[in-house]
């Protein structure tokens, strides 16, 4: 405690970020302050050099303060910089007592550029700062379904570069395009089609009606498979904005955030209103071992959503709850980010309060549907058995694959909300000369991405204690809090044998080794994760090997033998680099010893 007491007596009166650590140097909490000295001292009571938690703080904060042994500060120019740095460090390091919101993606917009002669609808996540561009969104889902429907219902130019070809393509032959590339339609006539496209984007009821008519025509012509495609697409588009029946007389442009939580679970709902209509909505389920702080959740939600410049900014942002201090901070952040004043408020009456109540009702409904399942019980049992600090709600699983240390690859699969999240899977080409070097490279590359893709609760490594120690060392150097276990396959490595629960695999934790019965549900849960990562890595290895074989065959056709191929690969590093190299460069390599 002497170190902590010394730090508390020498705090700066500057803006910055502070970090609390326990006696083992595990990161507990990250916060920011306009005045570090005032903010940090508010956590503690000091009497006769004895440090105790401030009794006015919440029980969650008091519990954390009892564990603080060290603190560090990072000074910045102003409070805005501190706010952004705090959010970035929380995502990267995942402290024990901070809430982590993972949904920081930029939602797509549909846009049409009317400065061109023949505008078409396209999807973007970037801003095109030019006149004549009209945006619609954001769409939390279904943007591609809308786009596909527009291109099928209307004779639009089907591809961005079609006009340059100056020749009608098959879309003209099947009556899906009017061939402006061959001047078969005037700009004025095409503009009428483009405006009809705009109307369908703005009025999804009309779009759905047109899709239903087409589905009925296909069905009456016994083209049932195509009709089913339209049925499924209609269902997806209908789900885009479940609140579209709420049309307000005032044409508000609003973003609405509602946070509801209890115990160790919470839900954040986001709704987007444009022109008085809710056009899309999204929600995120959040878990925390140490309870929730609404201010912290709202700050992360707002910063994550608005940190990237968005093409359509609302007139106002509505929140269901937030302290005056946090509201002021966020107001300054938004105004600074977009160089204009955008009001943040907590409505107390009228239409806007009704919108918040609807968002809260949806958050509560989603929360109540989160019933405890058998999988949740297994997660609790896994946490207890392996002595994990956190329930492993989000898990990343790693495996490598190679053939005689060639075509070395690695795979990461992700498991969350009781299912594999295939959109989050990642593949890696590796250079390591053995399985330990390959695993080290794989895990290091993942850890370096923590700032972009926040770390999970748990890493599961396909390997033994050596691989486990590699993972622990990498995480220690990254400063991030992620727990790790490893599972080593038994020598009798039959997939059929394992799938029946017969494997006697060994699970390693930092402090223990477990040999569980084949029927143990906790073992089977870990095996399920390991087997998916193994499948993913093996499939990537096979596709890489097949691609390389094709490349070798092509080089052989050009008169380059296997020994020469190896020399070229050793020098250039990949087949892609060989293809880009000039004949002179390749000849120079083949004449020198590598």
UniProtKB/Swiss-Prot annotation:
Subcellular location: Cytoplasm
Protein's name according to its UniProt entry: UvrABC system protein C
Keyword match DNA damage: yes
Any single Gene Ontology cellular-component annotation: cytoplasm
Keywords: Cytoplasm, DNA damage, DNA excision, DNA repair, Excision nuclease, SOS response
BP terms from Gene Ontology: nucleotide-excision repair; SOS response
Classification via PROSITE patterns: GIY_YIG (PS50164), UVR (PS50151), UVRC (PS50165)
Domain GIY-YIG: 13-99
Similarity remark: Belongs to the UvrC family.
The protein's assembly and partners: Interacts with UvrB in an incision complex.
Domain UVR: 205-240
Function: The UvrABC repair system catalyzes the recognition and processing of DNA lesions. UvrC both incises the 5' and 3' sides of the lesion. The N-terminal half is responsible for the 3' incision and the C-terminal half is responsible for the 5' incision.
Pfam families in the cross-refs: GIY-YIG (PF01541), UVR (PF02151), UvrC_RNaseH (PF22920), UvrC_RNaseH_dom (PF08459)
Positions of disulphide bridges: none
Molecular function terms from GO: DNA binding; excinuclease ABC activity
NCBIfam families, A to Z: uvrC
Organism of derivation: Helicobacter pylori (strain G27)
């Amino acid at each position: 405690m002497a170190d902590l007491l010394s730090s508390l007596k020498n705090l700066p009166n500057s803006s910055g970020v502070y970090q609390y650590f326990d006696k083992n140097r595990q990161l507990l909490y990250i916060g920011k302050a306009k005045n570090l000295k005032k903010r940090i001292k508010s956590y503690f009571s000091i009497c006769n050099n004895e440090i105790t938690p401030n009794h006015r703080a919440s029980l969650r904060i008091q519990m954390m303060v009892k564990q603080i042994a060290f603190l560090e500060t990072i000074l910045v120019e102003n409070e805005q910089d501190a706010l952004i740095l705090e959010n970035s460090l929380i995502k990267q390091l995942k402290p024990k007592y901070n809430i982590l919101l993972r949904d920081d993606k930029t939602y797509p917009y549909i846009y049409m550029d009317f400065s061109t002669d023949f505008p078409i609808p396209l999807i973007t996540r970037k801003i095109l700062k030019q006149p004549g561009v009209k945006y619609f969104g954001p769409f939390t889902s279904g943007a591609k379904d809308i786009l596909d429907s527009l291109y099928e219902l209307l004779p639009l130019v089907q591809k961005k570069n079609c006009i340059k070809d100056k020749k009608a393509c098959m879309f003209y032959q099947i009556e899906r395009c009017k061939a402006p590339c061959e001047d078969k339609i005037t700009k004025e006539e095409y503009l009428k089609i483009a405006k009809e496209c705009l109307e369908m984007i703005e009025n999804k009821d009309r779009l759905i009606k047109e899709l239903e008519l087409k589905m009925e025509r296909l069905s009456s012509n016994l083209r049932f498979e195509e009709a089913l495609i339209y049925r499924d697409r209609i269902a997806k588009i209908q789900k885009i904005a479940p609140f579209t029946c709420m049309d307000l007389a005032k044409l508000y442009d609003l973003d609405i955030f509602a946070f509801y939580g209890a115990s160790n679970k919470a839900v954040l709902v986001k709704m987007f209103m444009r022109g008085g209509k809710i056009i899309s909505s999204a929600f995120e389920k959040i878990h925390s071992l140490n309870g929730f702080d609404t201010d912290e959740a709202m700050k992360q939600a707002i910063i994550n959503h608005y940190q990237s410049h968005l093409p359509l900014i609302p007139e106002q942002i509505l929140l269901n709850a937030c302290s005056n201090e946090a509201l002021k901070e966020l107001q300054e952040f938004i105004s600074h980010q977009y160089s204009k004043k955008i009001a943040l408020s907590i409505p107390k009456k009228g239409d806007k309060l009704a919108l918040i109540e609807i968002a809260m009702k949806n958050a509560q409904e989603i929360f109540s549907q989160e019933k405890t399942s058998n999988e949740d019980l297994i997660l609790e049992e896994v946490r207890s058995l392996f002595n994990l600090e956190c329930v492993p709600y989000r898990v990343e699983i790693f495996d490598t694959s190679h053939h005689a240390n060639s075509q070395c690859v690695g795979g990461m699969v992700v498991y969350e909300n009781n299912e594999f999240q295939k959109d989050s899977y990642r593949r890696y080409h590796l250079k390591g000369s053995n399985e330990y070097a390959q695993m080290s490279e794989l895990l290091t590359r993942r850890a370096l991405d923590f700032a972009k893709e926040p770390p999970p609760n748990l890493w599961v490594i396909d390997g033994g204690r050596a691989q486990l120690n590699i993972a622990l060392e990498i995480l220690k150097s990254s400063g991030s809090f992620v727990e790790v276990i490893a599972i080593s396959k038994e020598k009798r490595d039959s997939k059929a044998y394992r799938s029946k629960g017969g494997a006697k695999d060994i699970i390693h934790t930092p402090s223990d080794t477990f040999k569980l019965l084949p029927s143990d549900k906790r073992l089977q849960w870990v095996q399920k994760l390991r087997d998916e990562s193994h499948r993913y890595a093996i499939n990537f290895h096979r596709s890489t090997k097949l691609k390389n074989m094709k490349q070798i065959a092509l080089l052989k056709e050009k008169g380059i033998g296997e020994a020469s191929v190896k020399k070229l690969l050793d020098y250039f590093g990949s087949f892609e680099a060989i293809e880009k190299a000039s004949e002179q460069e390749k000849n120079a390599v083949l004449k020198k010893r590598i």
